[in-house]
A protein has these predicted regions:
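Gly/Pro-rich turn-and-neighbor structural signature
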Residues: 1-27, 33, 141-167
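Solvent-exposed alpha-helices and their adjacent loops that cap or buttress functional pockets
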Residues: 16-19, 35-37, 49, 79-80, ...
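N-terminal leader/propeptide and maturation segments of large enzyme subunits in energy/redox metabolism
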Residues: 86-166
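Gly/Pro-rich active-site capping loops and adjacent beta-alpha segments
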Residues: 52-110
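A glycine- and small-aliphatic-rich helix-loop capping segment at beta-alpha/alpha-beta transitions
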Residues: 1, 43-47, 74
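A short, hydrophobic, proline-anchored segment that marks a local hinge/packing element in signaling
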Residues: 40-49, 57
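Short, Lys/Arg- and Gly-enriched loop/turn segments at beta-strand edges
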Residues: 33-39, 65-66
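GAF sensory domains
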Residues: 26-28, 37-43
Length: 167
């Protein structure tokens, strides 16, 4: 979870106030907190009572992302552009509407159609996550959600620190 959280902050800085309900953002850029080109993430802002309160995010390793060789692993690469398409934060869906130009630009640079389907599945998973989160927010309210989210993050931080201290 924490590997995705810094990118959410980066996306907020990147788009500023231009993040809307219904947006779906792709990202894999190693120069802006991505870990490798083939690991493409989908980010979906969650708005509750008109405010951005959370994100859902899904990351998957894709079979291809373009580049000099099929599959993305190029042991002879001397620069990142030989490893595949770099995707800085980009809205593929804005305010619930597919940006066909962006969608087609991305997939025109990828060899395998299965990647398009995998990315549709990632969007679906992020959308289901958003729906479920909105159900929880509606049932328990923003205050309880925020308190439990912070408690979960704090517990995770403590466990991670304990594991590192044990090394």
């Amino acid at each position: 979870a924490f590997s995705l959280a810094p990118v959410c902050k980066h996306i907020r800085q990147y788009f500023g106030d231009e993040i809307y309900p219904g947006d779906v953002i792709f990202h894999n850029d190693v120069f802006s907190l991505g870990n490798q080109n083939n690991d493409v993430a989908v980010y979906k802002p969650v708005f509750f009572e008109g405010r951005l309160v959370a994100w859902t995010a899904v990351k998957g390793h894709q079979a291809d992302i373009g580049g000099a060789v099929a599959g993305g692993y190029n042991p002879n690469a001397t620069e990142v552009w030989q490893e595949g398409l770099r995707i800085p934060p980009v809205k593929v869906i804005e305010k619930g509407k597919l940006r066909k130009d962006v969608w087609e630009l991305i997939f025109a640079n990828i060899r395998f159609d299965i990647v398009r389907h995998d990315m549709q599945a990632e969007i679906g998973a992020a959308t289901i996550g958003e729906r479920r989160l909105l159900e929880l927010l509606g049932k328990y309210g923003l205050e309880h959600f925020t308190a439990h989210k912070e408690a979960l993050f704090e517990a995770t931080r403590r466990m991670m620190e304990a594991e590192i201290a044990g090394i």
